[in-house]
């Protein structure tokens, strides 16, 4: 019993030290790959299970595979253009699987609002969302949105149950204002998820988008590990304190 307790305490101290080092490291300017490297160091295993929700062309997933070749990557992307590029970029990677669905709070079909851009950014597909654009239209006037398209959508809990995933090391999420939808459809899954990395905005870029404080309120078992602010927007890394 004593040995087990000391071992558990030692692992906890090790994780806390890594979290402090992570927080200290991000105070300095850092590259995207360095952020990925710091995150996988917190996972402390060679074969983590990672869900990339809103993966676009799969760039982040490929970075994780570069750092952890034995990782299992499950990628979700509802925009047909981005999904096609992701599938092409995947090539023969057998550790990375793509699902062309939107993750939300329901199963079935849902409207997706694809984005485009003006000028050199006419192929811009990084701002599409299942939520209608709102302040995004004035804040980023060079981005435009075409009429909605119907895409397949799944609840995270139902998808994970069918996939047979018993635990998840990291959810990497970029869903353009639909964070609360993912959370609502994934409450059971999140209880067995160790880390969440998500984009946020404290202005309502999309209809009904929640600010960071409200997102954190929906995740009471998660603590804020690190924040990467860009004005009133940014990204955060959260840790499940129950695991």
Curated annotation (Swiss-Prot):
This is 2-O-methyltransferase NoeI. Keywords: Cytoplasm, Methyltransferase, Nodulation, Plasmid, Transferase. It is found in: Cytoplasm. It is an enzyme of class 2 (transferase). Required for 2-O-methylation of the fucosyl group of Nod factors. Belongs to the FkbM methyltransferase family. GO terms for cellular component: cytoplasm.
């Amino acid at each position: 019993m004593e040995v087990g307790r000391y071992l558990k305490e030692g692992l906890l101290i090790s994780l806390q030290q890594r979290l402090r080092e992570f927080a200290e490291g991000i105070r300095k300017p850092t590259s995207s790959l360095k952020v990925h490297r710091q995150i996988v160091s917190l996972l402390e295993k060679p074969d983590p299970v990672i869900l990339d929700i809103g993966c676009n062309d799969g760039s982040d997933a490929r970075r994780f595979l570069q750092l952890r070749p034995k990782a299992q990557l499950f990628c979700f992307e509802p925009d047909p253009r981005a999904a096609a590029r992701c599938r092409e970029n995947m090539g023969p990677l057998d550790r990375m699987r793509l699902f062309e669905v939107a993750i939300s709070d329901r199963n079935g079909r849902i409207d997706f609002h694809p984005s485009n851009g003006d000028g050199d950014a006419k192929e811009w597909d990084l701002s599409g969302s299942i939520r209608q654009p709102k302040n995004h239209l004035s804040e980023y006037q060079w981005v435009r949105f075409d009429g909605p398209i119907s895409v397949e959508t799944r609840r995270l809990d139902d998808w994970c149950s069918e996939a047979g995933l018993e635990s998840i090391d990291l959810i990497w999420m970029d869903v353009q204002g639909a964070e609360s939808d993912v959370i609502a459809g994934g409450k059971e899954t999140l209880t067995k998820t160790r880390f969440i990395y998500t984009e946020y905005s404290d202005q309502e870029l999309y209809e009904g988008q929640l600010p960071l404080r409200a997102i954190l309120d929906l995740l009471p078992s998660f603590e804020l590990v690190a924040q990467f602010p860009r004005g009133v927007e940014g990204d955060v890394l959260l840790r499940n304190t129950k695991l």
